[in-house]
Amino acid sequence: LSRTINFDAFEPLVIAAKNAGVERFIYASSSSVYGGSEKTDVTESHPLVPLTLYNKYKGLCEPLLFKHETEDFVCTVIRPATLCGYAPRQRLDLTVNILTNWAINRRKITVFGGSQLRPNLHIQDMCDLYKQLLIEDGRKIRGQTFNVGYQNMSVMDIALLVKRVVQEETPGEADIRIEKCSSDDLRSYHINSDKIRKTIGFEPKY
């Protein structure tokens, strides 16, 4: 099912969009395509070493998109960090969101591992970037791949920040405890987003 949705259906979608007269295709890949890396800064040229099938197929779709690029069909790949922020249909499987949920509703945050680095990006910044890419000079973004990852923090540092903010926002409630457990999730990477900043001037606001 993962292959069917994330890989097999991708190229037919690109072809259908191109045949329908779509002029610009912005593909949301994932910064998780890098897997785990000990490099200080992971740039767009870093080898892709995905740790899951989902991220493997995300990476394999990138060259499929560029294969169909023409003068009238601008193709761009972005590799966003893990998103966070409020939504009407809240996702609670994302690092910042799930830790915040635990802090508010359990008054206890469970940290699995803790040393893993996880770049984050607010959902509103992601939406602002999509809007900017739709009107940006095509010559700047044609055939380009961009990291979009800021706030490179460890999972434990995120937990400590969530604890502080939630305690400040809920005075009088019980103190929030942090419980550390082992983890088999090895994803850890520090994303460098200098390229998109220098190319189109994108900076997160949230």
Language-model features: locations:
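NAD(P)H-binding glycine-rich loop region in Rossmannoid oxidoreductase-like domains
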Residues: 1-5
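Conserved catalytic Lys-bearing alpha helix of Rossmann-like short-chain dehydrogenase/reductases
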Residues: 7-13, 22, 55-65
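Conserved Rossmann-fold NAD(P)-dependent oxidoreductase catalytic core, especially the SDR/UDP-sugar
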Residues: 11-53
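Conserved SDR Rossmann-fold cofactor-binding beta-strand/turn motif
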Residues: 29-30, 79-80, 84
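Active-site Tyr-X1-5-Lys
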Residues: 36, 49-79, 104-105
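The catalytic Tyr-centered alpha-helix of NAD(P)H-dependent dehydrogenases
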Residues: 39, 50-57, 80, 88, ...
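C-terminal substrate-binding subdomain of Rossmann-fold SDR/epimerase-dehydratase oxidoreductases
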Residues: 106-107, 111-206
